[in-house]
């Protein structure tokens, strides 16, 4: 009974992994991840433009009208790394 149960589990796991790892073809996607470029701009261009509401006033949440928050985060991280390097000395990395 154990070999039959083990074979059933292998079949089930193989089926689930096969479904999870397979490529989903949509919007003219061909094998190998290539797309037909002729109709792609027409198809996706209308969705992208129509998908975002047009706002007349600039965004004021977290100052995103001036600058995205991500560069600020990376500059702050660089500043904090420089300060900790001054206090603790340069970092040594093990291979």
Swiss-Prot record:
The modification Pyrrolidone carboxylic acid is found at residue 23. Residues 1-22 form the signal peptide. The modification Glycine amide is found at residue 32. The keyword Secreted applies. One of its GO terms (molecular function) is hormone activity. GO terms for cellular component: extracellular space. Keywords: Amidation, Cleavage on pair of basic residues, Hormone, Pyrrolidone carboxylic acid, Secreted, Signal. It is found in: Secreted. Its main location: secreted. Stimulates the secretion of gonadotropins. Belongs to the GnRH family. This is Progonadoliberin-1. It comes from Morone saxatilis (Striped bass). The lineage of its organism: Eukaryota, Metazoa, Chordata, Craniata, Vertebrata.
């Amino acid at each position: 009974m154990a070999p039959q149960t083990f074979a059933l589990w292998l079949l089930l796991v193989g089926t689930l992994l096969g479904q999870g790892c397979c490529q989903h073809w949509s919007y003219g996607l061909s094998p190998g991840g290539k797309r037909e470029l002729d109709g792609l701009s027409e198809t996706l261009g209308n969705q992208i433009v129509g998908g975002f509401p047009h706002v007349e006033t600039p965004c004021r949440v977290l100052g995103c009208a001036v600058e995205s928050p991500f560069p600020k985060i990376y500059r702050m991280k660089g500043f904090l790394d420089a300060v900790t390097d001054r206090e603790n000395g340069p970092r040594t990395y093990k291979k």
